[in-house]
């Protein structure tokens, strides 16, 4: 699948098949996150891949809107070392991971992290140093169903020269 098709067909998936994802595929997806743009190329990220069902359940239970993480094959926690642009850098890495998952025929869903009260709890659970901040939790797996939700048409969001 080419990059444009991947971006135009990506969607948030919250229901997954009970099917594992190959380690090589996961590593390729994370490698795409690693290659994201970052301010002054600082690359402040660390990626924690969680396949263990019991740990995924703990993560799902801590979140307020991520219960489906428990049924996904994988949860990727994206953390960035605290700095001026940690949120932008980590968000770029997260989007690369979402697109890479789609390119591999997988579904994914970005669960917010940075502004959530559970962010420090998640960092402790996964053993991160105190100077790392949770950017996102990403559920990844084989989607239980296909289809795309409606999106706003381009004419509603594109403006030339001014609003």
Where are these regions (language model features)?
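Acidic, surface-exposed loops and disordered segments
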Residues: 1-163
